[in-house]
Amino acid sequence: MVGTPLFSNAKKILLLGSGELGKEVIIEAQRLGVECIAVDSYENAPAMQVAHRYHVIDMKDSGSLRAVIEREKPDLIVPEIEAINTDTLKEMETEGYHVVPTANAAKLTMDREGIRRLASEKLGLRTAKYEFADSLDELKEAVKRIGIPCIIKPIMSSSGKGQSTVKSEFDIEKSWDYAKSATRGIGTKVIVEEFVNFDYEITLLTARTAFGTKFCEPIGHIQIDGDYHESWQPHPMCSPTKAKAQEVAKKITDELGGYGIFGVELFIMDDEVIFSEVSPRPHDTGMVTMVTQKMSEFEIHVRSILGLPVNVDLSYPGASYVIKSEIYKWAPEYDIIEASKLKDTKIRLFGKPVAKIGRRMGVALSTAEDVSVARDTAKKAANIVKIK
């Protein structure tokens, strides 16, 4: 049952994290008559611009997080980022609040150690070989055992922040310092992963709903140092490998529980499926679904958490390409005229108040009968958007 926003019978969502993904979540929730409250650590974040109201707090601070939850008394608490005090979410859940998909899922997936041990040691899923290190000396020993090249990541970070590739022993200290600079939360622990020479990597968007688990078509993507640059859908997979990928995705999402969409990242190597990571929320590579699917990942997420049926069918092949800033500018302006002239192409600007060098400020979305054509068009569109 959904009531009327701003009245006593309203269904209320409290969104923790108000970036570009959260913005689309709120837009979809608004379409279904849900009252939306956005929370982030800075003013005028993208999702705040489309919410009924917002709060600026440090979501890692237990007292601040508890205060805003108790003030708003939401029906659903929807984490959109990792930088949240998940211990407080677990406490609030025991007090009767509903955390999406569950507080335990939010806690496990913000911590690479927790989710990796769950996937590998409890569920027996194949992963890259890994070790954890809590000091530079421990890291050096771990690298020796894993081998070079290898990947170093903070156990708590997002969007590839702090991730680097060690190509020689001379890179280890630099990678350690970089990981420490980007960690979210307390501590400096990192994960050391073997370098997987995969054939390709995909995101398998997996929707857990009251009507069962559904899988979107595989999304291919390119990440540079863990940061999404482009994605496309569908990525071709043979039926047996796709079935294996769906089996892996179902195992990990069933273990996490709750309803909503999960972005399951997988490496494919010689038709073997290797688990990488999972996010219990819409995934940045899934922005392509805004033009490729009958329902975007954002609509699927909102409908799933409201107990409504979803449609994961593909409408058109398509691609996305990130628009990044090359300047530092407060309140930037965008020239999108030429990009908007390209066939079957849409530009989505996130509305971030500050442009920073390398920061994602928007995305180009293109459809075509052939994925490769869509990829070329989206890349061209993104590259001709001018940020001033």
From Swiss-Prot:
N(1)-(5-phospho-beta-D-ribosyl)glycinamide binds at E20, L21, E80, D284, K352, R359, R360. Pathway: Purine metabolism; IMP biosynthesis via de novo pathway; N(2)-formyl-N(1)-(5-phospho-D-ribosyl)glycinamide from N(1)-(5-phospho-D-ribosyl)glycinamide (formate route): step 1/1. It comes from the Archaea. InterPro entries: ATP-grasp (IPR011761), ATP-grasp_carboxylate-amine (IPR003135), ATP_grasp_subdomain_1 (IPR013815), PreATP-grasp_dom_sf (IPR016185), PurT (IPR005862), PurT/PurK_preATP-grasp (IPR054350), PurT_C (IPR048740), Rudment_hybrid_motif (IPR011054). Transmembrane segments: none annotated. The keyword Lipoprotein does not apply. It catalyses: N(1)-(5-phospho-beta-D-ribosyl)glycinamide + formate + ATP = N(2)-formyl-N(1)-(5-phospho-beta-D-ribosyl)glycinamide + ADP + phosphate + H(+). GO terms for cellular component: cytosol. Residues 117-306 form the ATP-grasp domain. ATP binds at R112, K153, S158, S159, G160, K161, G162, Q163, E193, E194, F195, V196, E201. Mg(2+) binds at E265, E277. Pfam families: ATP-grasp, PurT_C, RS_preATP-grasp-like. SUPFAM superfamilies: Glutathione synthetase ATP-binding domain-like, PreATP-grasp domain, Rudiment single hybrid motif. It is an enzyme of class 6 (ligase). Its EC number is 6.3.1.21. The keyword Hydrolase does not apply. GO terms for molecular function: ATP binding; magnesium ion binding; phosphoribosylglycinamide formyltransferase 2 activity; phosphoribosylglycinamide formyltransferase activity. One of its GO terms (biological process) is 'de novo' IMP biosynthetic process. HAMAP family: PurT. Homodimer. Involved in the de novo purine biosynthesis. Catalyzes the transfer of formate to 5-phospho-ribosyl-glycinamide (GAR), producing 5-phospho-ribosyl-N-formylglycinamide (FGAR). Formate is provided by PurU via hydrolysis of 10-formyl-tetrahydrofolate. This is Formate-dependent phosphoribosylglycinamide formyltransferase. It comes from Methanococcus vannielii (strain ATCC 35089 / DSM 1224 / JCM 13029 / OCM 148 / SB). The gene is purT.
